[in-house]
Amino acid sequence: CKEKIEVLRCGLRAAEYPHACKNPAVFFNPLRQKIYDTCVRTLELCMHDHYEDCPWREQAMYALDSRNQMLCGYFAFGEFAFARASLELMCNDKGIDGYMTICFPTNFALKIPSFSLYWFMQMREYTEYSGDVTLVEKYFDKMQALLELFLSRVENGLIPNFYGDKTFWNFYEWSDGLSGNIFSEEEKRFDLPLNCLLSIAMSNTDFVRRVLGKSERYAQEKAALNDRIDETFFDAKKGLYRDFTDSKHYSEFGNALAVLCGAARGERAKRVGELISAKSNDLVPASLSTASFVYDAVLNIDKNRYADFVLGDIDAKYGYMLQAGATSFWETLSGEKDFGGAGSLCHGWSAMPIYYYHLLEQVRG
């Protein structure tokens, strides 16, 4: 074209998943309304052909990330086809050693063992909320085989970390001491989060067994594991559970898992709840990815007592991001400054307020 061209506008046309958002939630509290709406937008931005952690960096589906996303999506969108398609992709993972790969799909050899255990949680929650048992019917043998693979590593009642192998990354969350060492042959030790997640995976597998008309299989093994967790990791002086056998490291996340798996019981659980919900507790704080486990733990201890704590904590953290100009929620509270300037400003695992608002807030409409 020889004539001059005048560019009137440059832009992007969104191509979004065509979900039907049923009865958008309306709240009396304007801050919570803004948080909820931004969480829903964050979820939408992380939905393409499957759930993805973020829309600009890896664009990959991880088990922990997608567990948070799926649970929130059940409430925000009231549909299950997208979650099922994502779970089918995970269920067809072909890890050469039987453990799930770091994300789906991939031919990358790296694995995060704890993430394999979140898959059991995802399968249970999908079944519970959708009422569809055909997915767990189809992949029950895979669930059983993967759980048995983890249990085959148990030594003296506990599972050690995945040591001496660079293809395993002992990652739990992006917080001090819990992010592991990628591409490293770590030394052997026993980790509280891994053992608690294994205990929870046994509960989730027995739930699926009951749904499928099978007898429970893991109740005794779970009880024995919980006893060993309590014996090994509990620090009576602090009234807390330490994260590792080789160090005095205490986190909100690890202690929350001790409550959720049933290792912390009775007065010990109550004390843990008081400490992990305290403003100044000297514990490694839970990140946005795992704060939900802290919320679940204290709500399991006493829902009436801790509901305001959960809602207030969400107000503070998510209100901070909104005040900083967020139009979608971040990977961590450090925003783009994290990871050497590569922090994600739109991360699906941070949409968890959706679930807690439906659980605890008064919703209109």
Describe each PLM feature range:
Residues 1-34:
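Extended acidic/polar, glycine-enriched regions
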Residues 25-81, 90:
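Structured secondary-structure scaffolds
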Residues 61-77, 81-365:
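Active-site core of glycosidic bond-cleaving carbohydrate-active enzymes
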